[in-house]
Curated annotation (Swiss-Prot):
InterPro entries: DUF4885. It comes from Bacillus subtilis (strain 168). This is Uncharacterized protein YbdO.
Length: 394
């Protein structure tokens, strides 16, 4: 299993806490490299073939410490322009993205695949690794690294040596010296990126249908759950409203926009209600699996019943068990949604608010409403402040 994004973010958070309590001290040591080691490390720099990543220097005399280099790699990896492919559904709530964690793994994979190749040419690879990072009397000792960096290199090189490829990485690697990461910033960067992609996709959709929204016009798109019907407000131009509503409701565009709004919600969002969200989850699951909408069904003895007189949960169970994969976990889903449907039936479907979501639009960008964080174009000053606060420097 490869190191996943969540694991890295967890390590980042832990490192941030530790760094606040015990700032790392770096020792300046004199260099005494063995010729063979110097050649090996220099070769790492010259042989690197991955675009962008090869800017990182793995040589003994100059371990990477350039946050600007990492920034360029990150920006290059996520420089994607949306084009019109002709598909009906243009808006996508989840677009391809390379996070800081993804890029760090790529950099470490490249570095340590090469280091592993060098280590394996030695008669005693493990002894050679120990000499570099644990034996201060060895001519191979990496005196230019801090104690934490030597430990990271030891962990990462032995991981490759014993397993053939890293399953876990020690992230205090010298290749990221002087580059500060933070899990919360990483999560927010992805939301900003996704907003940029959806903004482009929406513009493609408008351009394709020859819809022009005048500069300065401030619109609000409101979307209902399950059927994903869109209502546009903010202008007296009824023709413009009709055009936008029609194009957003083509394909799955309104559904994808709804999901994008949901994924962009911050913790203080006034639009989020746990009760309404759980109702949406249950109603959506029933609709997508059985084709029945809860609001159209009768409740008899606390159970939702289809027009044919069947218990909706029986239909749900039957549909799940048609899929060999879903059949293995069907019992858990059935138990959970049976409980949720019972709660909705007891309270009354209409007594629980619908999970209706809205988002503003102006000057070519979607803009979040009812929350302190907006991911729209020109609205992310709060993120720059967070980066300064957390010391993120890429």
């Amino acid at each position: 299993m490869r190191l996943n994004r969540q694991f890295i973010r967890t390590q980042l958070i832990a490192q941030n806490i530790l760094s606040k309590n015990a700032p790392a001290k770096r020792e300046n040591a004199t260099e005494n490299p063995a010729a063979v080691l110097e050649k090996a490390y220099s070769r790492l720099k010259s042989q690197s073939s991955t675009g962008g990543i090869n800017q990182f220097n793995y040589s003994k005399t100059s371990v990477s410490g350039n946050s600007g280099t990492f920034s360029k790699v990150y920006q290059s990896a996520n420089d994607r322009t949306v084009t019109d492919t002709g598909e009906e559904t243009v808006i996508q709530s989840q677009n391809p993205y390379e996070s800081e964690s993804d890029i760090r793994i790529k950099i470490l994979d490249e570095k340590y695949s090469r280091m592993n190749a060098i280590n394996k040419t030695k008669s005693d690879p493990l002894g050679y690794i120990k000499d570099k990072y644990q034996n201060s009397k060895s001519p191979y000792f990496r005196s230019d690294l801090s104690a934490a960096e030597r430990q990271a290199a030891y962990d990462n090189e032995t991981e490759w040596l014993f397993k053939g490829k890293a399953q876990n990485y020690n992230l205090q690697d010298a290749v990221f010296r002087n580059v500060t990461f933070h899990g919360e910033v990483e999560a927010e960067n992805e939301k900003v990126y996704q907003r940029g992609q959806v903004n482009q996709q929406l513009q493609v959709l408008l351009n394709r249908n020859h819809i022009h929204i005048p500069e300065g016009t401030e619109l609000t798109f409101t979307i209902t759950p399950i059927d994903y019907q869109v209502r546009v407000s903010g202008t007296d131009d009824q023709d413009l409203i009709k055009q936008i509503e029609q194009v957003l409701q083509s394909g799955d565009n309104s559904k994808e926009l709804f999901l994008h709004i949901m994924k962009s919600q911050s913790s203080d969002s006034a639009q989020f209600s746990e009760e309404a969200y759980k109702k949406y989850q249950a109603a959506r699951e029933m609709y997508e699996v059985t084709g029945y909408h809860l609001k159209d069904l009768e409740v008899i003895d606390g159970r939702y019943v289809t027009p044919e007189g069947r218990d909706l949960m029986d239909v749900y169970k039957e549909e799940l068990e048609k899929d060999p994969v879903q059949k293995q976990t069907a019992s858990y889903a059935i138990s959970y949604y049976r409980s949720e449907l019972s709660k909705i039936a007891e309270a009354g479907y209409n007594a629980i608010p619908d999970f209706i979501l809205s988002i503003d639009y102006s000057n070519g960008s979607l803009r979040d409403v009812g929350q302190s964080k907006s991911y729209g174009t020109g609205d992310t000053g709060w993120l720059e402040a967070l980066k300064r606060q957390t010391g993120v420097n890429y």
